[in-house]
């Protein structure tokens, strides 16, 4: 495995909005978690990027460069550093196509976006053949067929979480006023936590029983909050730009940063700082919950691997969010 130089292990301090530090002007507490990257990251990134540059219909050379700079395979390799070598490419391709679709949805109404995603659902199941002249259709179909060819049972376990995520993307909840608590409940679906958990299990060939998943419920929810809020903190400038340039519904600003700033009557930068402190508390909470699981004698080998995988998702998400050019308007 490739251990990342842990930029989270030092106190973060930066000034200026969109500088890669979320616009912070004061030191932030260090993360308790250490990111690790999959050892095949360089090879897989090249393979996956080349595939999408060949098959996806990018409207311009600028957008092709922006796609490469976003480094979607890189974040997948940070999410799942313990993925099997013959499965990490599947995970990279799935998250990449979902990111690309997410960008398209910003320029659609919620109704248009819902129709777009709903058309892809039976294609993903293999119930409907794709239109080979439409890249998103055949990319989606071919990916799911190849995943099922590799491990039909575990691939099919990812389907429903993906559909929940896709429907959350166009849920009208996102354009309604929300408090922080209800927002985090919505984001558990929109950030794709169940999707990431199922994809982690597939990528690691990690078999966890339904009973064990129930035991992990609170740990999963805690992780979801961390993923959602870190994403919000570092993507705020990107989402703000989208709210001004994209569709009024698809690009609507839906973020814990704005919600907390409005509720507490504090600045955006102050809201970001408070949210990062909250994430550090969720990291502590994760450690407490894992220790309770161990103390109760309920932590099997599969559960140990699962909860460690959640740590890598949290640390990997933060590492990528702080460095990706997707959130820093360089390209």
Swiss-Prot record:
Organism (species): Penicillium expansum
Biased composition annotated in UniProt, kind: Low complexity: 7-16
UniProt-recorded name of the protein: (+)-aristolochene synthase TS1
Domain writeup: Contains several highly conserved motifs that are important for catalytic activity including the aspartate-rich 'DDxx(x)D/E' motif and the 'NDxxSxxxD/E' motif, both of which are involved in complexing Mg(2+) ions to coordinate the binding of the isoprenyl diphosphate substrate in the active site.
UniProt-annotated binding residues for (2E,6E)-farnesyl diphosphate: 326-327
Name of the gene encoding the protein in the UniProt record: TS1
A Pfam family hit: Terpene_syn_C_2
Cofactor: Mg(2+)
Presence of the UniProt keyword Metal-binding in the record: yes
Cofactor: how bound: Binds 3 Mg(2+) ions per monomer.
């Amino acid at each position: 495995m490739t251990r990342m130089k842990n930029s989270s292990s030092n106190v973060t301090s930066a000034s200026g909005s969109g500088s890669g530090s979320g616009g912070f002007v004061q030191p932030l507490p260090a993360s308790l978690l250490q990111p690790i990257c999959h050892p095949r990251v360089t090879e897989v990134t090249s393979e996956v990027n080349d595939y999408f540059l060949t098959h996806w219909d990018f409207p311009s050379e600028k957008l092709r460069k922006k796609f490469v700079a976003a480094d979607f395979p890189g974040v997948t390799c940070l999410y799942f550093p313990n993925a099997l070598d013959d499965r990490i490419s599947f995970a990279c391709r799935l998250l990449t196509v979902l990111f690309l679709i997410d960008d398209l949805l910003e320029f659609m109404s919620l109704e248009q976006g819902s129709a777009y995603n709903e058309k892809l659902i039976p294609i993903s199941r293999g119930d409907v053949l794709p239109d080979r002249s439409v890249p998103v259709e055949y990319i989606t179909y071919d990916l799911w067929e190849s995943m099922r060819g590799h491990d039909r049972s575990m691939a099919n376990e990812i389907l429903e979480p993906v559909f929940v995520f896709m429907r959350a993307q166009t849920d009208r909840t996102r354009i309604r006023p929300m408090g922080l608590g209800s927002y985090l409940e919505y984001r558990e679906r929109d950030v794709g936590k169940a999707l990431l958990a199922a994809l982690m299990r597939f990528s690691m060939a990690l078999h966890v029983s339904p009973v064990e998943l129930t035991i992990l419920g609170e740990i999963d929810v805690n992780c979801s909050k961390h993923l959602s809020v870190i994403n919000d903190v570092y993507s705020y400038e990107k989402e703000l730009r989208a709210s001004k340039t994209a569709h009024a519904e698809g690009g609507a600003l839906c973020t814990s940063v704005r919600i907390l700033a409005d509720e507490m009557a504090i600045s955006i930068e102050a809201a970001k700082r408070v949210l990062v402190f909250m994430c550090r508390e969720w990291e502590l909470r994760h450690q407490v919950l894992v220790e309770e699981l161990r103390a109760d004698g309920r932590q099997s080998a599969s559960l140990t691997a699962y909860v460690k995988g959640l740590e890598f998702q949290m640390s990997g998400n933060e590492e990528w969010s702080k460095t990706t050019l997707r959130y820093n308007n360089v390209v």
